[in-house]
């Protein structure tokens, strides 16, 4: 008898890998999904469901015409990045201190969650001499982003600010 354990992604129901084990009808299926799931978590996946482990121990059936197929479903982990925190660095653990933590993808290298816009007003007389001190104003903007740890894709949210207009200057 043969049992097939398929690991699929919720993103397009794509098969990530397949394991096959064989044995005799009535015997327990000697297999564990733990190591594969751990590896996928390191790559940035989350476990959605595990048909093989659900419901207890599995036994080879007596139907020789069909393989027993179990599906382990995984989703791509998307991690939010708060603009008020330091930006993540590529290839560093998402969860420091956890040995099996996935790592930030290279796409976070130039993550741009903060932006400033400045204006400078120069006060000068007609002859070009300084009339009074310059006025410099800066507006600060920030945005959240969501990083897909598997693909590296970054989804940026809208820019926000506490003040989006320069002060009136005379």
Whereabouts are the PLM-identified features?
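Surface-exposed interfaces of beta-sheet-rich extracellular modules
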Residues: 31-65, 84-85, 157-170
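Short, ordered, surface-exposed loop/turn motifs in non-cytosolic proteins
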Residues: 11-24, 128-149
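Detector for intrinsically disordered, low-structure N-terminal pre-sequences
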Residues: 7, 20, 47, 116, ...
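Conserved "repeat-terminator" motif of extracellular CCP/Sushi domains
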Residues: 1-8, 58-118, 122-124
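Surface-exposed intrinsically disordered loops and tails
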Residues: 24-27, 59, 81-105, 144-168
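Solvent-exposed, conformationally flexible loop/turn segments
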Residues: 24-32, 63-67, 114, 142-144
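N-terminal compositionally biased, intrinsically disordered segments and leader/signal-like regions
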Residues: 11, 18-19, 23, 34-35, ...
């Amino acid at each position: 008898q043969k049992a097939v354990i398929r690991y699929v992604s919720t993103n397009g129901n794509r098969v990530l890998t397949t394991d096959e084990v064989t044995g005799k009808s009535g015997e327990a299926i000697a297999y564990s999904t733990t190591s594969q799931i751990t590896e996928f978590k390191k790559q940035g996946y989350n476990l959605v469901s595990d048909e093989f482990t659900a419901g207890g121990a599995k036994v080879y059936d007596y139907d020789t015409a069909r393989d027993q197929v179990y599906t382990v479903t995984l989703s791509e982990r998307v991690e939010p990045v708060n603009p008020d925190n330091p930006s993540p660095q590529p290839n560093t653990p998402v969860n420091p201190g956890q040995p099996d933590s996935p790592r930030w993808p290279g796409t976070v290298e130039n993550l741009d969650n903060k932006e400033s816009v400045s204006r400078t007003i120069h006060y000068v007389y007609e002859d070009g001499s300084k009339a009074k001190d310059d006025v410099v104003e800066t507006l600060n903007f920030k945005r959240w982003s969501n990083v897909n740890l598997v693909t590296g894709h970054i989804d940026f949210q809208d820019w926000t600010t506490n003040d989006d207009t320069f002060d009136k200057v005379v």
